[in-house]
C-alpha cells in the first residue's frame, strides 16, 4: 500500500504550487466566462498540466452545448413579470396575478431547481470540460475523482460595492414585495369580479391604496436588474481555481514522490460553466453515463476553498434539496479528524445555490461537496475581490491534506478487498 505521509507533510508546498498556478491563469489568460474562449483556454492548459506534469495517461478536453445566459436570465423574466403585474393591478388584477405566478415559476425552475426550462431563450455557446485519469498498475478495484469548475462568475455589482448583507437584503425585499403584490392582485381580482377596469379610490379605496403601497418596492425591483453584470467576469481565483488545483496538486505530488497505486485510479474532472447553472457537470454526467460503473467510483467536488472557519462537507446541496452520498461525505470528515484539521458538517442552504456535487448526485454518482466559504455572502464572492492576491494558502493546505488522507483511506480499503 502506498505511503502518502510525505504528501501530507508537504502540504504547504502543495498550497504554494496551487497559488502560483492560479496566479498564472488569472494574470496571463483570458477571463473564464462560462462558454467563452477563456474557459476553453484554461481547460486546455490544465489538461496539459495533468498529462505532462501529473502523469495522467488520459487527459481529454471535451465540449458541450449550453445557454449560459439563461441561469441569471430568470431575473429579467421574473422582475419584468412583477413590474408588468404591478401595472396590471390597476386595470386587470387577475392578469397581474398570472404574470407574477409565471415570474416565480421561472425563478424556481432556473434558480431553485437549476432546470433548463428557459434555456432556449438565450444564445447557445460551447462550454468546456476536462476528464483526466491516472491509471493504476494492477487490477482496477476503485476510482476517485477530484472535481472543480474552471469557469469564473460574472461580477455581482451590489455585493462588490456594498457587501453580502445588502445584496441578500435586496433579494429578500423583492421576494416579499412580489408575494405581497401577487396575493393583493388575487384579492383585487376577486373583489372586482375578475373584470377589466380602471382602479380608482372611488371604485374601491382599500384595493386602490394597497396598489399604491406596492410602489414602494419598485426601486428594489429595478435594483435586481443590476444584481449581476454579464459584461464583467471576475478572476475566480477562489471560486473556483482553488478547487481545480486541489486534484491537480495531489496528482502532481504523487508523481513527484513516485507514488503509483496498484488498484485505485485517480482522476480530475474539470466541469465548466458551473456558474451558468452546473451546465458542465450536467453535460459531463450525460456524456459519461455508465462509463465508470465498473468499480466503486467516488467524486469529491470542491468549491471556493478560502476560509478555514467554514471548511466543511455539504451533506445537502442545491438549495438544500439534494442529498450528497453519506459514505463519501463521512469519509472526508473522517480524514479531517485523522489529520487534525477542523471540518464542519454543513449544507448548501435554501437560496444558497448549488455546487457541481449536486449534478453528480442527481445523476447517480457517489459524490459529496466540500466548501470553505461563509454561506452568508462575503464581499469576495462573485466580485472583483475574488482575485489571485486574495487566496488563503493555509486553507488550501489543510483541505489538500484532508483530500490526500481521504484518497489514502479509499485506496487502503479497496486494496484490502
Locations of regions flagged by a protein language model:
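N-terminal hydrophobic or amphipathic helices/low-complexity stretches enriched
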Residues: 1-38, 47-58, 72-73, 134-135, ...
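Second-shell loop/turn segments in exported
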Residues: 5-12, 29-37, 118, 231-238, ...
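Soluble non-cytosolic domains of exported or imported proteins
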Residues: 12, 16-19, 33-41, 241, ...
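Extracytoplasmic/secreted proteins, especially bacterial periplasmic and envelope-associated proteins
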Residues: 17-20, 24, 41, 45, ...
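Active-site-adjacent substrate-binding region
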Residues: 30-31, 63, 305-417
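A non-catalytic alpha/beta surface segment that caps or lines the substrate-entry region
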Residues: 31-135, 157-206, 344
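Acidic/histidine-rich catalytic neighborhood of metal-dependent amide-processing enzymes
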Residues: 103-131, 139-142, 152-157, 188-214, ...
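Short beta-strand element of the alpha/beta-hydrolase
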Residues: 143-147
Amino acid at each position: 500500500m502506498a505511503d502518502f505521509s510525505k504528501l501530507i507533510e508537504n502540504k504547504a508546498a502543495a498550497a504554494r504550487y496551487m497559488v502560483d498556478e492560479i496566479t498564472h491563469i488569472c494574470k496571463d489568460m483570458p477571463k473564464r466566462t462560462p462558454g467563452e474562449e477563456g474557459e476553453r483556454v484554461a481547460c486546455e492548459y490544465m489538461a496539459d498540466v495533468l498529462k505532462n506534469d501529473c502523469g495522467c495517461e488520459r487527459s481529454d478536453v471535451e465540449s458541450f452545448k449550453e445557454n449560459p445566459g439563461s441561469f441569471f436570465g430568470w431575473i429579467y423574466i421574473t422582475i419584468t413579470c412583477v413590474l408588468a403585474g404591478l401595472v396590471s393591478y390597476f386595470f386587470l388584477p387577475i392578469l397581474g396575478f398570472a404574470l407574477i405566478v409565471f415570474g416565480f415559476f421561472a425563478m424556481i425552475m432556473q434558480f431553485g431547481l437549476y432546470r433548463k426550462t428557459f434555456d432556449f431563450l438565450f444564445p447557445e455557446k460551447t462550454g468546456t470540460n476536462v476528464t483526466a485519469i491516472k491509471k493504476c498498475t494492477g487490477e482496477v478495484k476503485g476510482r476517485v475523482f477530484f472535481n472543480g469548475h474552471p469557469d469564473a462568475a460574472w461580477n455581482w455589482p451590489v455585493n462588490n460595492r456594498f457587501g453580502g448583507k445588502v445584496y441578500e437584503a435586496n433579494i429578500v425585499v423583492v421576494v416579499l414585495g412580489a408575494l405581497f403584490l401577487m396575493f393583493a392582485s388575487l384579492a383585487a381580482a376577486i373583489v372586482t369580479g375578475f373584470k377589466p377596469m380602471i382602479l380608482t379610490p372611488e371604485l374601491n379605496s382599500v384595493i386602490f391604496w394597497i396598489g399604491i403601497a406596492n410602489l414602494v418596492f419598485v426601486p428594489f425591483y429595478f435594483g435586481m436588474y443590476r444584481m449581476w453584470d454579464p459584461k464583467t467576469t471576475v478572476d475566480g481565483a477562489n471560486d473556483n481555481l482553488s478547487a481545480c488545483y486541489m486534484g491537480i496538486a495531489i496528482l502532481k505530488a504523487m508523481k513527484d514522490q513516485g507514488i503509483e497505486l496498484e488498484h485505485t485510479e485517480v482522476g480530475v474532472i474539470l466541469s465548466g460553466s458551473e456558474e451558468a447553472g452546473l451546465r458542465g457537470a450536467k453535460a459531463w454526467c450525460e456524456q459519461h453515463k455508465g462509463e465508470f460503473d465498473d468499480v466503486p467510483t467516488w467524486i469529491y467536488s470542491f468549491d471556493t476553498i478560502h476560509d478555514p472557519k467554514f471548511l466543511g462537507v455539504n451533506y445537502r446541496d442545491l438549495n438544500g434539496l439534494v442529498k450528497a452520498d453519506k459514505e463519501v461525505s463521512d469519509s472526508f470528515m473522517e480524514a479531517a479528524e485523522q489529520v487534525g484539521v477542523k471540518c464542519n458538517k454543513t449544507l448548501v442552504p435554501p437560496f444558497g445555490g448549488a455546487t457541481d456535487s449536486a449534478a453528480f448526485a442527481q445523476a447517480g454518482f457517489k459524490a459529496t461537496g466540500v466548501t470553505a466559504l461563509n454561506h452568508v455572502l462575503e464581499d469576495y464572492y462573485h466580485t472583483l475581490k475574488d482575485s489571485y492576491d486574495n487566496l488563503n494558502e493555509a486553507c488550501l493546505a489543510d483541505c489538500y491534506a484532508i483530500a490526500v488522507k481521504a484518497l489514502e483511506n479509499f485506496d487502503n480499503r479497496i486494496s484490502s478487498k
